């Protein structure tokens, strides 16, 4: 595996390649990331991964400086997995050599709801860096995880509207044996919090069961699920059932027509904020 730190080095290694598959990450890799890279290898060759902690997507009170930088360990994991040909690990000056005054702004009806409501500017930062990375790598395929469901939708829509020649492929959420979605932030959980953490996924499973059984008062079942988590010590930001196609609130006619739905949640357990989702 080649490790490169500049855009020019990256392009030199990829010259003449037209089936590149790409997985962007912020590092601190776990089995979920490695699963994305394995899927990327099925869709193209060579596989490029990136590790870049993107300041633009962190709010003023978020954990940019605290976010784990584990490049040496990440390189060892990637070399052991043997799925990645080039790792692109730029520093901030390489990605942002001047102030990033031009940015991608997702539409309000998608970028300012759910995660966007609680993390203003987050999806603008994500969209901007993904567009820059796609410009650097120029892949045929890019792989994203469904754990970040709203992010996946925004990236797909951005690529479609800008007519970028890249297919966005989604990987199912990778979970621990007890159902907890794998996340770099899980390392912040205390042992007691780690034991409690699967309750978030269980709340989503309960919503799925109730909708499958015919529940139609979605605000009521969302409220009950959030209250149940709060009673266990969670601080719930949102727990919502939305349409898969646009993440808008389902209307009665959507429920009657069998519109595909997804339940999404974000909640804090202690100081750690976890997100998850489940297609219904």
Swiss-Prot record:
MF (Gene Ontology): ATP binding; pantoate-beta-alanine ligase activity
Pathway: Cofactor biosynthesis; (R)-pantothenate biosynthesis; (R)-pantothenate from (R)-pantoate and beta-alanine: step 1/1
Known partners and oligomeric status: Homodimer.
Function: Catalyzes the condensation of pantoate with beta-alanine in an ATP-dependent reaction via a pantoyl-adenylate intermediate.
SUPFAM superfamilies in the record: Nucleotidylyl transferase
NCBIfam families referenced in this protein's UniProt entry, alphabetically: cyt_tran_rel, panC
Entry binding sites for (R)-pantoate: 57, 151
Binding of ATP, residues: 26-33, 145-148, 174, 182-185
Subcellular location: Cytoplasm
InterPro entries: Cyt_trans-like (IPR004821), Pantoate_ligase (IPR003721), Pantoate_ligase_C (IPR042176), Rossmann-like_a/b/a_fold (IPR014729)
Substrates-to-products reaction catalysed: (R)-pantoate + beta-alanine + ATP = (R)-pantothenate + AMP + diphosphate + H(+)
Sites where the protein binds beta-alanine: 57
Keyword line: ATP-binding, Cytoplasm, Ligase, Nucleotide-binding, Pantothenate biosynthesis
Protein known as: Pantothenate synthetase
Annotated GO biological process: pantothenate biosynthetic process
Catalytic site positions: 33 (proton donor)
Organism: Bordetella petrii (strain ATCC BAA-461 / DSM 12804 / CCUG 43448)
Family in the record: Belongs to the pantothenate synthetase family.
Principal cellular location given in the protein's record: cytoplasm
CDD domains from the UniProt entry: PanC
Protein's UniProt keywords contain Cytoplasm: yes
Misc. comment: The reaction proceeds by a bi uni uni bi ping pong mechanism.
């Amino acid at each position: 595996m080649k490790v490169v730190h500049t855009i020019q080095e990256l392009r030199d290694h990829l010259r003449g390649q037209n089936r590149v598959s790409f997985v962007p990450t912020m590092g601190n890799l776990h089995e979920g990331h490695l699963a994305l890279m394995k899927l990327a290898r099925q869709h193209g060759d060579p596989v490029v991964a990136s590790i870049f902690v993107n300041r633009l997507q962190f709010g003023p009170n978020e954990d940019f400086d605290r976010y784990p930088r584990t490049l040496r360990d990440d390189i060892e994991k990637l070399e052991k997995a043997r799925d990645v040909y080039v790792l692109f690990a730029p520093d901030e000056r390489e990605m942002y050599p001047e102030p990033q005054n031009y940015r991608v702004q997702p539409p309000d009806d998608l970028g300012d709801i759910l995660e966007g409501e609680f993390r203003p500017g987050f999806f603008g930062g994500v969209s901007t860096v993904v567009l820059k990375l796609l410009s650097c790598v120029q892949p045929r395929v890019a792989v994203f995880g469904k754990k970040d469901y709203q992010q996946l939708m925004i990236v797909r829509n951005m690529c479609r509207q800008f007519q970028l020649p890249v297919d966005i492929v989604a990987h199912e959420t990778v979970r621990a044996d007890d159902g907890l979605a794998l996340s770099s932030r899980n390392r912040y959980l205390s042992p007691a919090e780690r034991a409690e953490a699967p309750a978030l996924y269980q709340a989503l499973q309960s919503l799925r069961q109730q909708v499958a059984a015919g529940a139609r008062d979605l605000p009521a079942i969302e409220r009950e699920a959030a209250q149940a988590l709060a009673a266990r010590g969670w601080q719930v930001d949102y727990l919502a059932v939305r349409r898969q196609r646009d993440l808008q609130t389902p209307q009665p006619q959507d429920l009657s027509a069998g519109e595909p739905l997804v339940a999404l949640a974000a909640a804090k357990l202690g100081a750690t904020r976890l997100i998850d989702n489940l297609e219904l």
